[in-house]
């Protein structure tokens, strides 16, 4: 089978343009955040979702009512209504934990694990879509 250079070029461009759309920096929700440690690697608290929330884009988490949410950061300033965290997949791990943001109003914090007192700047990786 002979493939024309134009067709080959279109195929290559479509593959690479799809990758660039998936991996990209998104607009920052806030300039500062509160974390439990300097790396934001320790959860601040555990919370339970009070209602479903469907993620509007790749920066956010889709959360279902009753799910346990691990809160890793709390945005400050213009993004203060959003927290960052993760929800676990099912018990057997079919779904990997995914980090993202969600409205703080849809969860109830049930257990504080470590106070979120470390005030730090957000960076482009905090809002990067994979």
From Swiss-Prot:
Supply the induction statement.
Answer: Repressed by retinoic acid.
Q: Can the keyword Signal be found in this entry's annotation?
A: yes
| PTMs per UniProt | May possess two intramolecular disulfide bonds.
| Signal peptide (residue range) | 1-22
The reply on keyword Secreted is yes
InterPro entries, A to Z: MIA, SH3-like_dom_sf, SH3_domain
Q: Which GO terms of the molecular function aspect are on file? A: growth factor activity
Q: Family membership, please give it.
A: Belongs to the MIA/OTOR family.
General function of this protein: May function during cartilage development and maintenance.
Q: What is the protein name given in its UniProt record?
A: Melanoma-derived growth regulatory protein
**Gene source species:** Rattus norvegicus (Rat)
Classification from the root reads: Eukaryota, Metazoa, Chordata, Craniata, Vertebrata
Gene behind this protein: Mia
């Amino acid at each position: 089978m002979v493939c024309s250079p134009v067709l080959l070029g279109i195929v290559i461009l479509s593959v690479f343009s799809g990758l660039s759309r998936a991996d990209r920096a998104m607009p920052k929700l806030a300039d500062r955040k509160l974390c439990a440690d300097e790396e934001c690697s320790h959860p601040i608290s555990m919370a339970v979702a009070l209602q479903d929330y469907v993620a509007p884009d790749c920066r956010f988490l889709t959360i279902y009512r009753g799910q346990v949410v691990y809160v890793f950061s709390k945005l400050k300033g213009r993004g203060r209504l959003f927290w960052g965290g993760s929800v676990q997949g099912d018990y057997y791990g079919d779904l990997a934990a995914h980090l993202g943001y969600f409205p703080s109003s849809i969860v109830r914090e049930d257990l504080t694990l470590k106070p979120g007192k470390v005030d730090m700047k957000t960076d482009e990786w905090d809002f990067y879509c994979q």
